[in-house]
């Protein structure tokens, strides 16, 4: 039901096992961990302190059991239409890649892939918003970075078939992605099936 991580490879092993969900709401911490760690001001993501926390602990236990529940309010920042704070999702991923280059070389491929998924996540939000015309240069830059990772994503076993279609379509054409997104909503409405597109 769970796994205990410890030792000098703690961070690498946790990340390689896929347990790098970076939100703090699904974790329990010793209070003393935050004696010297503070969340950065005006940041959208909790994730900026992820490596800092793991570098200060000697053991991490990851459980599959449900311990408590997270309630997402309608006015939660996670539900807002695109705003510039969402770009922090990319900033922390690129920071992690930079950290991997400096201290965790074995995590470079994983963090590089993580960056591509960050571009996908943010551009997916932007492509579905009314702001895409006002932020066209940003959209094009994210699209360029996504195209660099198409082969990486297609070969990955971390992305399902529908996710690969969504990623590739967004990397190639905003209109194609938007069309597939609307088609997905239509199919879901008719069949009641889950979304085929991410995000």
Feature roles, as predicted:
Residues 106-114:
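All-alpha amphipathic helical-bundle segments outside canonical DNA-binding/catalytic cores
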Residues 128-199:
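Membrane-interface aromatic/basic loop that binds lipid-linked glycans or pyrophosphate carriers
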Residues 67-73, 79-107, 121-151:
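Catalytic core of nucleotide-sugar-dependent glycosyltransferases
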Residues 36, 56, 99, 113, ...:
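Active-site catalytic microenvironments for nucleophilic, acid-base chemistry
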Residues 116-119:
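GST superfamily/GST-like fold recognition
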Residues 2-83:
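Conserved nucleotide-sugar donor-binding catalytic segment
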């Amino acid at each position: 039901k769970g796994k205990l991580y410890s030792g000098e490879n703690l961070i690498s092993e946790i990340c390689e096992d896929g347990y790098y969900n970076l939100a703090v709401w699904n974790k329990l911490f010793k209070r003393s961990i935050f004696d010297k760690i503070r969340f950065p001001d005006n940041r959208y993501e909790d994730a900026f302190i992820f490596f800092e926390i793991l570098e200060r602990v000697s053991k991490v236990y990851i459980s599959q059991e449900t311990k408590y529940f997270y309630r997402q309010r309608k006015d939660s920042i996670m539900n807002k239409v695109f705003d510039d704070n969402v770009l922090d999702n990319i900033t922390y991923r690129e920071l992690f890649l930079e950290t991997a280059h400096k201290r965790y070389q074995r995590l470079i491929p994983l963090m590089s892939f993580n960056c591509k998924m960050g571009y996908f996540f943010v551009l997916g939000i932007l492509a579905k918003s009314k702001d895409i015309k006002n932020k066209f240069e940003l959209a094009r830059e994210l699209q360029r970075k996504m195209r660099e990772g198409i082969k990486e994503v297609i070969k990955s076993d971390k992305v399902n078939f529908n996710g690969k279609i969504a990623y590739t379509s967004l990397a190639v054409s905003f209109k194609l992605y938007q069309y597939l997104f609307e088609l997905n909503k239509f199919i879901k409405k008719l069949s009641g099936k889950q979304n085929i597109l991410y995000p």
